[in-house]
A protein has these predicted regions:
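Short, conserved beta-strand element in jelly-roll/cupin
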Residues: 99, 110-126
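Short beta-strand His + acidic residue motifs that chelate non-heme Fe in jelly-roll/DSBH
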Residues: 106-109, 126-128, 153-167
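A short hydrophobic beta-strand segment most commonly corresponding to one strand
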Residues: 116-122, 152-154, 168-179
Length: 179
C-alpha cells in the first residue's frame, strides 16, 4: 500500500523552499498550503486545500482542475515537482503541503486516486494507517511510518486510510495528487 520510490529529493533544499512558502502563506486552521490552483483562482495558496467531499458528497470540483503551479513557488521546488511528475509519467493535480499537529490526525477515508508523499518533517510516533477489512485476529488496521529520508512514496489512498500524529512535534508532508 506504500511504495518507496527511487526518486529522491534533497530534503534540506525542499525545507528551505518550504520556509519561504510559509512566509508568503502562513499556516491557518486548515493546516494546508496549496501549491497548485485552478485557472482564474483568486486565492492561489488556498484554492486547492481541504477536501473535495463533504459528508461523502462531491463538491463538484475535480482533482483534474488543479492545473496551475503557483508562480510564487521557489524555482528549485517547481523544478523538483516537474521532474518528479515526468519521472512517474503523471501530470500534477492538487499539490499541497499538509501538516498534522501533535496528537492530531485525519478520519478514516479513501481518495479517488493514489497520492505521492514527500515527508518534510515527522517523528517516530507519526503513522499512516490502513483499515483491515478482514480484521484477522482482531487486527483492525495496519500502521506504517514514513521517514523524512528524501524519498517520494507512492501511497494507495484508494483504500480506507487515516493518519495520526501521536508525537510531540508536527508532521509535514508534501502531497501530490496526479491527474
Amino acid at each position: 500500500m506504500i511504495e518507496k520510490l527511487d526518486f529522491k529529493a534533497d530534503i534540506q533544499t525542499v525545507l528551505n523552499d518550504f520556509d519561504t512558502i510559509v512566509k508568503m502563506s502562513p499556516w491557518d486552521d486548515d493546516h494546508q498550503i496549496g501549491l497548485t490552483h485552478r485557472p482564474n483562482a483568486t486565492n492561489l495558496w488556498k484554492d486547492s486545500v481541504g477536501s473535495l467531499y463533504t459528508n461523502g458528497k462531491s463538491s463538484g470540483v475535480s482533482e483534474n482542475e488543479f492545473t496551475e503551479l503557483n508562480a510564487q513557488i521557489p524555482e528549485t521546488l517547481k523544478t523538483l515537482l516537474l521532474d518528479f511528475a515526468q519521472s512517474q509519467n503523471i501530470k500534477l493535480g492538487r499539490v499541497r503541503i499538509m501538516r498534522a499537529l501533535s496528537k492530531r490526525g485525519l478520519t478514516v477515508h479513501r481518495d479517488t486516486s493514489v497520492r505521492y508523499h514527500l515527508v518534510l518533517k515527522t517523528n517516530i510516533d507519526s503513522f499512516f494507517g490502513f483499515r483491515d477489512l478482514k480484521q484477522t485476529n482482531g487486527v483492525a488496521a495496519h500502521c506504517y511510518h514514513m521517514p523524512a529520508d528524501g524519498h517520494f512514496y507512492k501511497v494507495d489512498t484508494t483504500k480506507f486510510h487515516f493518519i495520526y500524529n501521536g508525537g510531540k512535534t508536527e508532521r509535514i508532508h508534501l502531497v501530490i495528487c496526479p491527474r
